């Protein structure tokens, strides 16, 4: 019983330590969000590695922002340009991590319906487009089913109410539909070229979620998948996991055939669970 009591406390201490590690950057990002969105801002939730499993060398700072009304074009551009100053690609800065900000309008997701609409997303992968004056519009985003499930399971409210109070639970069939839809992104080697590690780890997470109905950190899902993989695919996931944790160099691109077989095997296992 004492272990049951002390474990959540230990996890909270760890989580607070991780948040403290990025507190300066976090307060800058939240400051930018508040400055541009203040009158319409309902909530800001920190989710992902920072609060579940700990930040790894290349982990993003993930924020989910909820507002009451759509953003006008002037606000959208000004906000994105200012967020650019608070973020850096992995390995580019000694003090800044990559920031990913997803903005949703309250009435687009509450009550919940699938697929839901995303008002804005900012991430380092958009940097060149943003600098060229290209800004992504609001769009339907199947990933919101996964993102909101993550936020309800593990997040910290930096502004506004707790995620589990604010958001409806995402029905399991919608989560499965989103997971299944994500699988269609990866069919042949060009689909994962340059992003091998992330695709291997994301497939592990999707497999874990399909079987358990829950969402796990990448390294935890990789360990889980490792126990279920045939021996010939284990080196792929082991290398992805070690590279993610910063323990080894990422050489997955040199395992082309093995990698392709791994992707098709895991997709097959996931499809057995979620259909299609």
Residue ranges and their predicted role:
Residues 1-13:
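N-terminal amphipathic/basic-hydrophobic helices that include classical n-h-c signal peptides
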Residues 14, 18, 81-193, 200, ...:
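Conserved NTP/Mg2+-binding pocket subregion across the NTase superfamily
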Residues 14-16, 65, 245-251:
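Glycine- and acidic
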Residues 176, 180-239:
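Extended, basic/helix-rich recognition subdomains
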Residues 214-276:
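Structured mid-to-C-terminal alpha-helical surface segments
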């Amino acid at each position: 019983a004492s272990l049951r009591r002390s474990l959540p406390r230990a996890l909270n201490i760890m989580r607070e330590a991780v948040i403290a590690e990025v507190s300066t950057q976090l307060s800058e990002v939240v400051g930018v969000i508040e400055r541009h969105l203040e009158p319409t801002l309902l909530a800001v939730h920190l989710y992902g590695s920072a609060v579940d499993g700990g930040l790894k060398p290349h982990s993003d700072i993930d924020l989910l922002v909820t507002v009451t009304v759509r953003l006008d074009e002037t606000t959208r551009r000004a906000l994105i340009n200012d967020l650019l100053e608070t973020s850096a690609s992995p390995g580019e800065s000694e003090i800044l991590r990559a920031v990913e900000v997803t903005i949703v309008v309250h009435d687009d997701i509450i009550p919940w319906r699938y697929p839901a609409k995303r008002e804005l997303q900012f991430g380092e992968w958009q940097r060149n487009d943003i600098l060229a004056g290209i800004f992504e519009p609001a769009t339907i985003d199947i990933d919101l089913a996964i993102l909101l499930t993550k936020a309800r399971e593990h997040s910290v409210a930096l502004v506004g109410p707790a995620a589990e109070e604010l958001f409806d639970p995402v029905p399991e069939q919608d989560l499965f539909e989103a997971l299944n839809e994500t699988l269609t992104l990866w069919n042949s080697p060009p689909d994962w070229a340059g992003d091998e590690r992330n695709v291997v780890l994301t497939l592990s997470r999707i497999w874990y979620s399909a079987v358990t109905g829950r969402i796990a950190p990448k390294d935890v899902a990789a360990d889980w998948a490792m126990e279920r993989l045939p021996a010939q695919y284990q080196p792929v996931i082991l290398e992805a996991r070690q590279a993610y944790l910063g323990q080894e160099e990422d050489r997955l691109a040199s395992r082309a055939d093995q990698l392709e077989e791994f992707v098709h095997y895991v997709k097959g296992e996931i499809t057995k669970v979620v259909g299609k």
